[in-house]
């Protein structure tokens, strides 16, 4: 056997069929697509249909669900709070809660509470009443001389 004698096995490569080239070809006019209907038109694919093969969304396992009662918190970074204090929208000694943040324009509306996050720097001594707080944010507030109280549904979890 020589390199120039190597060939594919018989039937390994199927020759393509040219459709729509006359009645005598056996695949003329409609080209094996049948008559009329969505599937006979060009440019139309049925979403998720993989030619009879089991579609990907059915091959993969079902997973999880969307909890309708999951609380939706407003995330507020310490940098935003400090900017509001610097602009005179928040009092330095006041207690900062969801209502105060809405009034200051830091958040548009209070959802299920406010979660305090640590991005940015807080210089003002403030006491916060929030639904949730990250460990680093709590540390930063206490470092600035303030305090954080967790209120609402997360308060029970924090107390335990």
From Swiss-Prot:
Gene3D superfamilies: 3.100.10.10
GO biological process, one term: translation
Biased composition (Gly residues): 21-35
Region (Disordered): 1-41
Biased composition regions of type Basic and acidic residues, renumbered to the chain: 1-13
GO cellular component, one term: cytosolic large ribosomal subunit
Molecular function per GO: rRNA binding; structural constituent of ribosome
PROSITE patterns per the UniProt record, alphabetical: RIBOSOMAL_L15
Keywords: Ribonucleoprotein, Ribosomal protein, RNA-binding, rRNA-binding
Subunit details: Part of the 50S ribosomal subunit.
NCBIfam families in the record: rplO_bact
Protein name per UniProt: Large ribosomal subunit protein uL15
High-level lineage: Bacteria, Pseudomonadati, Pseudomonadota, Alphaproteobacteria, Hyphomicrobiales
